[in-house]
Amino acid sequence: GLWSKIKTAGKSVAKAAAKAAVKAVTNAV
């Protein structure tokens, strides 16, 4: 249903944000 779609989207967004954060930290160091 709609809620599971929202949950899935939230998970992928969180994953992308985590990847971006790791990249930013790596570039800073």
UniProtKB/Swiss-Prot annotation:
Tissue specificity as recorded in UniProt: Expressed by the skin glands.
Organism the protein comes from: Phyllomedusa sauvagei (Sauvage's leaf frog)
Function: Potent antimicrobial peptide with activity against bacteria and protozoa. Also has activity against fungi. Probably acts by disturbing membrane functions with its amphipathic structure.
Keyword Chloroplast: no
Major localisation: secreted
A single GO BP: killing of cells of another organism
UniProt-recorded name of the protein: Dermaseptin-S5
Family: Belongs to the frog skin active peptide (FSAP) family. Dermaseptin subfamily.
CC per GO annotation: extracellular region
Localization annotation: Secreted
Species lineage: Eukaryota, Metazoa, Chordata, Craniata, Vertebrata
Keywords: Amphibian defense peptide, Antibiotic, Antimicrobial, Fungicide, Secreted
